[in-house]
Every structure is written in structure tokens, then in C-alpha cells.
Amino acid sequence: LTTVRHLMHAGDEMPLVPSDTPMAGALLVMSQKGFGVVGVTDAGGRLTGIVTDGDLRRHMDGLLSHVVSEVMTHNPLTVAPDALAQSALATMNARKITCLFVVPPDGDGRPDGILQIHDCLRAGVA
């Protein structure tokens, strides 16, 4: 059985920005990393939010005049690194989302990685 840890992207692959990042910078990271989302972290590196394409659409007017903390969805859904990939895939399907940040349940809230629905599908998780 495959766990999230085996499929997740970690380190520099993670699309993360501090909460005071201007939206132009967040869009750049979102494009460079290729996940279609960007995670938002506080000064301690803890995941506090996520910016998705839906957030971008909701804030189209004057988008670039904002910082990420004004646009983000707070308290994003996450998955534990030891969770089964099949469970993560089921969550993504049920919630109609394509990515989950991987955060250890007993940690300090800092993300270990990000899992994309395509990672599960490529690995044959169904």
C-alpha cells in the first residue's frame, strides 16, 4: 500500500510563500512550481492558507493590489504523510480539489510536501 510520503513533492518543489507576499509574487511561484496552487505560511513556516484558481477568480478586481493573506483560503485541508494515498485521492475527489499539502499531525504545522491528484493516478492509486 502506497503512502502519501512516497508520492509527495517536497523541499524546493513546494509552492510556498509568506503571508505578506504581493499577489504578483504568488502568481509567479504558482506558475513556476506548476501545481496550480500556492501555500501561504506564517513567520514560523506553518501553513496558514492556500491560494487556488478559485480564490483568484473571486478576487479578480484589483487582484494585484492585494497580498496573499487577503486572498487565501484559511485553514486548508491537509493530509498526513503516513496516510494512504488511496485515502488522499478519495478526499481530493470528494472535495473536488487537485492538491493537498502534507502536514504531519503531530508536528508544528509546517508542511512536509504537497500531493497532486495526478501523482496518485500516475502511481496507479485508485
Language-model region placement:
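Bateman (tandem CBS) regulatory domains
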Residues: T2-M14, L64-P76
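Helical hairpin unit composed of two closely spaced alpha helices linked by a short loop
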Residues: G34-L64, V68-N75, P81-A90
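Short hydrophobic beta-strand motif reused across regulatory alpha/beta modules
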Residues: T48-T52, T98, D112-C120
